Amino acid sequence: MAKPEKVSAVAEITEQFKGSTAAVITEYRGLTVGNITTLRRALGEGATYSVAKNTLVKRAAAEAGVEGLDDLFVGPTAIAFIKGEPVDAAKALKNFAKDNKALIIKGGYMDGAALSVDEVNKIADLESREILLAKLAGAMKGNLAKAAGLFNAPASQVARLAAALQEKKAAEGGAAEAPAEAAAES
């Protein structure tokens, strides 16, 4: 690769690092072009999967301010640059690696910190943002319904007490009249 090509490749990779919310570093040894194409489709529109030379990636990472990944840039390396939510892309990579043993997840980078393989897998095991928001909304709706029931309970209790008191007075009034009538008859 000629020097101007290397400079432009480093600049492109640097921009990918800067524009990504997360990156997952993988080893692709043994994958076919068809496998990689399938993986790119599985990652969706929020991620790109790029193969690059390790020396160029190291230089680009340093220029982007990404630290702690140099040990991962050994052997045939490809990087999934993720824009947006990292959960879905990490899940796609984990599932693809499960089905294709040739893909090895080496680690990643997110929120200014290097990630181990276990941390990438933990991210992949999380539920998507939409599902978590739906669960939160459901929990809030249930709690609001309970609160409404609690606020309505005192009013209904007062109404029941008033009705019971009225019935009691009516019964006492009727009971008081009955002995008076019995005394008048005698």
Swiss-Prot record:
Assigned protein family: Belongs to the universal ribosomal protein uL10 family.
One example GO MF annotation: structural constituent of ribosome
Gene Ontology biological process: translation
GO cellular component: large ribosomal subunit
Top-level taxon: Bacteria
CDD domains assigned: Ribosomal_L10
Alphabetized UniProt keyword annotations: Ribonucleoprotein, Ribosomal protein, RNA-binding, rRNA-binding
Protein name, as recorded: Large ribosomal subunit protein uL10
SUPFAM superfamilies hit by this protein: Ribosomal protein L10-like
Organism: Rhodococcus opacus (strain B4)
Function: Forms part of the ribosomal stalk, playing a central role in the interaction of the ribosome with GTP-bound translation factors.
Gene name of this polypeptide: rplJ
Pfam family, one: Ribosomal_L10
Matching NCBIfam families: PRK00099.1-1
Subunit (UniProt): Part of the ribosomal stalk of the 50S ribosomal subunit. The N-terminus interacts with L11 and the large rRNA to form the base of the stalk. The C-terminus forms an elongated spine to which L12 dimers bind in a sequential fashion forming a multimeric L10(L12)X complex.
Entries under PANTHER family matching the protein: 39S RIBOSOMAL PROTEIN L10, MITOCHONDRIAL
